[in-house]
A protein has these predicted regions:
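Short S/T/G/P-rich N-terminal loop/turn motif that feeds into the first structured element of a domain
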Residues: 1-44, 48-53, 62-66, 88-99
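An amphipathic, aromatic/His-enriched active-site/gating alpha helix that lines ligand/cofactor pockets
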Residues: 60-92
Length: 99
């Protein structure tokens, strides 16, 4: 199942200015595939809105708890507040509309 994770942080916790957070991002990036796999998840895509201090990650996983556990193990909870949304593709949504 697909989950869109929305991650927000304050400007003072931004990897662009906080060296400790930047180091965490570099470690997370290097270990992401392995950590996600340990929770039965895979990375499907990611987007960053630098000025809004928002990150969006699309994760395929067995359930929201696995996605949340992976986010914690990746260290994302250290500087972000996360919201996890179950999502489907637009084609799936349109295909599910009543005739």
């Amino acid at each position: 199942m697909l989950y869109m994770m929305s991650l927000s942080h304050s400007p003072d916790k931004c990897p662009g200015v906080a060296i400790e957070i930047r180091d965490r991002v570099m470690r997370m990036n290097a270990t992401m595939t392995e950590v996600l796999k340990s929770h039965g998840c895979t990375f499907q895509g990611g987007w960053v809105s630098k000025g809004a201090h928002l990150t969006f990650m699309l994760i395929d996983g067995p359930n929201a708890h696995a996605v949340d556990d992976a986010a914690v193990d990746l260290g994302l909870a250290v500087w972000n507040t996360s919201t996890i949304y179950p999502v489907i593709t637009m084609d799936e949504a349109v295909g599910g509309l009543p005739s």
